[in-house]
A protein has these predicted regions:
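C-terminal alpha-helical interaction appendages
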Residues: 1-51
Length: 51
């Protein structure tokens, strides 16, 4: 796993946690992007690809 893939995995976990805590997707996405150095499009794509 590359560093970018690892960051994306962590960001996806963070995004899902914030959504589970009641944040709406746009706010959770912004908080995650502010906290972690990941590409917005890659994170949204990973989120949309979840089962």
């Amino acid at each position: 796993m590359t560093l970018q893939e690892h960051r994306l995995s962590l960001a996806l976990d963070c995004l899902n946690t914030l959504i589970d805590q009641g944040y709406e997707f746009p706010e959770a996405l912004n908080k995650t992007l502010q906290a972690l150095a990941v590409n917005r499009d890659e994170l949204v794509s990973a989120y949309d690809s979840q089962p």
